Amino acid sequence: MQVFTGTDKVKRGLAQMLKGGVIMDVTNAEQAEIAEEAGAVAVMALERVPADIRAQGGVARMADPKKIKEIMSAVSIPVMAKVRIGHFVEAQILEALGVDFIDESEVLTPADEKYHINKHLFKVPFVCGARDLGEALRRIAEGAAMIRTKGEAGTGNVVEAVRHMRQIMDEIRALALLPDEELVAKAKELGAPLELVIETKKLGRLPVVNFAAGGIATPADAALMMHLGADGVFVGSGIFKSKDPRKRARAIVLAVTYYDDPYVLAEISEDLGEPMPGIDVRKLSETELLQVRGW
């Protein structure tokens, strides 16, 4: 049977291959090599990690194509890159560069406050963030092949990632108990297509892989998110803003694999050096929150 590249089935299948793994933010080829050596299943190429974007402010855009190509040349694992919400030209550029996945990310400054990218128009699979089931299903309806919790990137504080993962999982469990007669009304409430609501109820999970992201800084954080139902984790600032990135990267990869073994977790959490300085999310103003970007 002939398989056509770029179909939803193929794109979702590519994302499935990353299940159970760790995807790490990197800003140069050296960091990408450290991530690959540590066992990352993919790297996210970007100009600045979320902690620096938060600290420095300004408009955060797609990374320089030269930097992305350098990272792609340095590693054999898949390379992802971020685009601004709604900026389909940035996405076209990344597809032309040959990246393996595109993240339409709230971490970058949104380019369009009305529309997200129509991801069905691209052959490359997309990753998108979500805080709840409705948001996740709307992104999947637009063509996303992978969902991740938004969390609150660049804080080193896992509380929002926990909140978003619990919210999505709780809504899926509630959906499973809903009579079929109420699904049309539920789809309208979620702002999502009925067929995706039906599929989610039938599967008892999202139709695509759902990774955890936003504030994961320690092996324990990564293991916690796996316990809550994540298919894998993204780690942004938590690795390369720590004292010993190489050791912490390896520990987080092992934590995702052995998340259900506290003895292994205790061993790998030992002597990692200082983690990244964290931010109390409660002290952030509404304008400082990244998770509220998108709809």
From Swiss-Prot:
InterPro entries the record matches: Aldolase_TIM, PdxS/SNZ, PdxS/SNZ_N, RibuloseP-bd_barrel
Pathway as given in its UniProt record: Cofactor biosynthesis; pyridoxal 5'-phosphate biosynthesis
SUPFAM superfamilies per record: Ribulose-phoshate binding barrel
Binding site for D-glyceraldehyde 3-phosphate: R166
Family: Belongs to the PdxS/SNZ family.
Record note on quaternary structure: In the presence of PdxT, forms a dodecamer of heterodimers.
Protein name: Pyridoxal 5'-phosphate synthase subunit PdxS
